[in-house]
Amino acid sequence: MKLAMIGFGQAGGKVVDKFVEYDRERNAGIVRAAVAVNSAKADLLGLKNIPKDQRVLIGQSRVKGHGVGADNELGAEIAEEDIDEVQGAIDSIPVHEVDAFLVVSGLGGGTGSGGAPVLAKHLKRIYTEPVYGLGILPGSDEGGIYTLNAARSFQTFVREVDNLLVFDNDAWRKTGESVQGGYDEINEEIVNRFGVLFGAGEVQDGQEVAESVVDSSEIINTLAGGGVSTVGYASEGVEPRKNNGGGLLSRLTGGDEPDDNLDTAHTTNRITSLVRKAALGRLTLPCEIEGAERALLVLAGPPEHLNRKGIERGRKWIEEQTGSMEVRGGDYPIPGAEKVAGVILLSGVTNVPRIKELQQVAIEAQDNIEEIRQESDSNLETLINDDEDELESLF
């Protein structure tokens, strides 16, 4: 699937920057174009892989390149005012070669959480291609203002995109890690999961063709109903075969020698085990998978370690667990890979306790901020006025 990726804000820019690096290293053919948008000049300068002419600084007249200070209402205003500058960078994207737009943003900050929904609305008005969002939720320990920003941005972002893929920082934090190390690892996790998902079906010249191809239309159809999506991932190390002579026919027939039957059974069992682990393990947004409207399963790895029987069994298991009859599946052969990975996209999930918890904390933070503001006005009056009101101000 060929994507035009737009990173909005600091977190969004870093994730898209990482996607460009991933795409280049693996020759995956996912990122057709990449743009970074920010109101903080320093954040744009910190990017390594996005071309400099595709980095857009907005809000210079309002915030002088210093960011919006976690004020996402200001972030939304700036994005609306400077949308033409962003469009200028998007104009250089060969849209006829793109399957969809992906707007990536952290939902807890100011620029991204305010500006990403504005950009998504703008793109949907102009282009016929689907516009997806990738929203990153802040950790619950990051503070009330970031939780409030995330709850408000999430609500708006879901309405403005064709589908919102969500990654929850809370589910991926590790104790004792540095701030920088923690975010780098989280960005790595995001890119690995979505890289396998979007990379399936993008075959370059000379590459192995999948037995059951997952092309961009299958991903688009899985995301078509809108709402919120989550992604599961599991992998297992394997020994790649020295001579990759098996190819498509051997995978269809179960091997080129009769004694390959044991290997076929082992391969099938590994695939079904990976599917279960991906669906029931750590999802990008933890939720109950029962009730998901649609699902897509992609198995990636050396071609000799993939087979149709395992994928069919995995697909059937997902149907049983979700109750959905709209479960697509396929493989993504990567000759010479040292692991087999299973990726599951669950679209239209609704039983998400983390979102309800986020909203509850946000409401408390909103009430608390208003209360403190009122108290602050009263306390300031008490401080500056004398008790008997005998002093007169200068003017």
UniProtKB/Swiss-Prot annotation:
Q: Which GO terms describe its biological process?
A: cell division; microtubule-based process; regulation of cell shape
InterPro entries in the cross-refs: CetZ (IPR032907), CetZ_C (IPR048737), FtsZ/CetZ (IPR045061), Tubulin/FtsZ-like_C (IPR037103), Tubulin/FtsZ_GTPase_sf (IPR036525), Tubulin_CS (IPR017975), Tubulin_FtsZ_GTPase (IPR003008)
Recorded superkingdom:
Archaea
Positions that bind GTP: 10-14, 110-112, 142, 169, 187
**Which Pfam families does the UniProt entry name for this protein?**
CetZ_C, Tubulin
Compartment(s) where it occurs, according to its Swiss-Prot or TrEMBL record: Cytoplasm
Q: Which PROSITE patterns match?
A: TUBULIN
Q: Name one GO cellular component term.
A: cell division site
Q: Which cysteines are joined by disulfide bonds?
A: none
List the keywords (alphabetical).
Answer: Cell shape, Cytoplasm, GTP-binding, Nucleotide-binding
Q: What happens when the gene is disrupted?
A: Swimming defect. No differences in growth rate or cell size.
Gene3D superfamilies with a match to the protein in the record: Tubulin/FtsZ, C-terminal domain, Tubulin/FtsZ, GTPase domain
A GO molecular function assigned to this protein is: GTP binding
Q: Which family does it belong to?
A: Belongs to the CetZ family.
Job description of the protein: Involved in cell shape control. Essential for the development of a rod-shaped cell type required for efficient swimming.
What is the designated name of this protein? Tubulin-like protein CetZ1
Q: Which organism is it from?
A: Haloferax volcanii (strain ATCC 29605 / DSM 3757 / JCM 8879 / NBRC 14742 / NCIMB 2012 / VKM B-1768 / DS2)
Q: Which gene carries the instructions for this protein?
A: cetZ1
